[in-house]
Each structure stands twice: as C-alpha cells, then as structure tokens.
Amino acid sequence: MTVYRVVLAEEAADDLLRIEDFTIERELASATTDLGVVRRLRDAVDRALRLLEFSPYSCRKAARALNDKQRELIIPFGSAGLIAAFEVRGEVVRIGAVRHQLEQDYH
C-alpha cells in the first residue's frame, strides 16, 4: 500500500487562513456565536487531508482537469464545506488551493 505525502502549497496555506477569517466573521455576525467553530474547522480539514495519505484517487477529478492526476477533495463542514484542489505527483499529493463553498469567487 502506497502512503502518499501530503504537501500544502503556500497558496493553499494562505487559503486556509483566509477561510478561518471568513468563518470567524460569519460566526461573529450570527445570532448564536460559537467560539469553537475554528477548532472544528481545523479538525475537519485535518481529517479530510489524512484521507489523501492513503487514497487520493478516490476523490473526484477536477472539473477542468488536464489529466487524471488533478483532483478535488470535498471537505464537509457545517451547512456547506470546502473544496481542496490537488494534484498527485508520484507519491506526493500537492494541495494547490482551498475554497469555501460560500465564498463569492467559488463558482
């Protein structure tokens, strides 16, 4: 069994920080603020990324993929979720971008 090494590109790491900020802003604007939301977000991302260590090809092919190595991981979270765009190169899974499904530029 191949164990893949998961690597976050700098852009993807920046995306995750931006998504945390986005999540905090949405939560602070809600009527019932939940301060544990960021911890749960991080846990959801960590769990999902661990899947890529063992089974990256179980994720869907990217919509505009140039080859079968470009994939998307759906990360369920709350009423929406996140999409992590990644590419498999040998035994390395490189995550290039992460988007929240409620962001304006998601579509």
Question: What are the functions of these language-model segments?
Answer:
Residues 1-71, 77, 106:
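Basic, Lys/Arg-enriched alpha-helical interface segments
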Residues 74-107:
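Enriched for short, Lys/Arg-rich terminal
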